[in-house]
Amino acid sequence: MKLGEVIQRVQSLYSRDVQSDDSRLSSRHIYNKLLTVRTRLISQKSKQKQKINDWNYQTISCIEMIDIQPHECPCAPAVNCTVKRSRYMIPKVMTDYNNNLIDYVMTIDSGDKFDFTNKSEMLHINGNKYTASKRRYLIDNDYLFAYGKDVPQILQIRALFEDPIEAVKFTTLCSSEVNERCIDIFDMEFPMDGDTIDIAVQLTSEELIVLFKQNMEDVSNDTGDIPVINSKG
């Protein structure tokens, strides 16, 4: 379903319950709440070890990987092992128990996958001559780092990103500034499967309605606290 359609569905449900001249919400306001609900629903599935539908994932292809100095690496590469870093920060990936929800990082030509690793694991790996040169990746400070005997200049990543728009707008070797300016975000496919998106629309609308009513109560209470001054004349 297109993002514009999802936002419109939320707005329609919201407007039915909120009878006010101020009931029209901005698309950005709806989108931000929708992201919160989407992340919560997907995280719940992940924690319960349920399969996450492929529709929820996004793939960023043609990620430019650049050579960096050893002191720029979160983990020093082993002997005969090279390391490259993405030129730009990767859009934030959803996490589950401190693990990034990434399906894969792989080459775009041969489809060779890189294994996930972390800083502590790399310390043990570097001391093993049989596994030190194996292709691995990690995310550090939102950058993608790739280790291995031969790390290509271009990689692709498939993951559950917190903000789908940021994933679509990510600058790659396959994109251009002109193309980025021409993206109509409301026409992009919102990465959620059909069953879950219905739930997300309902929850997003309900939570926005609750916020509206809370704000109305706060305004009413503030008005009631204003002292009445009787003038004598």
Regions found by a protein language model. Give the residues of each.
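Glycine-enriched, solvent-exposed interface loops adjoining structured elements
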Residues: 1-233
